[in-house]
Amino acid sequence: MTDSVSVVIPALNEERTVAHVVRACLADEPLEVIVIDADSSDETAAEAQAAGARVLNWREILPEDPRPGKGESLWRGVVAAEGDIVVFIDADLESAAPGMVSALTEPFIDPHIQMVKARYQRSFQGKPTGGGRVTELTAKPLVRQFFPELAHIDQPLGGEYALRRAAAMELPFVEGYGVEAGLLLDVAKR
């Protein structure tokens, strides 16, 4: 793949896990790994920087004050990113591992691909499934009902995914934690 890759890690008080996530992402040698710190009150920024990330406070990126929520961190990360592909990874992903960024970007060899969502197993009621309680009982049934073409998506709410930066610049990023589902639906409608 010849597209350049930026990794954006939104973070708020994730000092315990952010360095691990940064190191896992850097192992795949992206153009850059950016941690967007949403005014953490702990050592998140210092831990991320020590691990090799470029750390930006979300207030530094745009002149307007940030609106509260994860979507704002993600949007500001897109604005700050320089890569053709933007990979989003949650700062608290304890299972982050080398190869994760490459796996999310490989499908972009197809120029028609606009978004790639991670797929991983989480148990629910003692059975391996694609997601936790909210995903299995709410998100996936709603997606199957109203967007059957997306029924194959195991993690519609997951925070690990990649977008072409050009497409991301045209999408609305909602403020709260529904941002992942919103982006998925918006990309599907394009």
Segments (PLM) and residue ranges:
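Short, well-formed alpha-helical segments that are part of the catalytic scaffolds
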Residues: 13-27
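The conserved acidic donor/metal-binding loop of glycosyltransferases
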Residues: 90-95
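A short, conserved alpha-helix in the catalytic core of glycosyltransferases
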Residues: 167, 176-190
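A conserved acidic beta->alpha catalytic loop
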Residues: 37-46
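Short aromatic/hydrophobic "clamp" motif used to bind/position activated sugar donors
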Residues: 86
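Acceptor/aglycone-binding surface of glycosyltransferases and processive sugar-polymer synthases
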Residues: 62-76, 96-167
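Conserved donor nucleotide-binding strand/loop of the catalytic core
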Residues: 31, 45-76, 80
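Cell-envelope/extracellular polymer assembly enzymes that use nucleotide-activated donors
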Residues: 4-6, 32, 182, 187
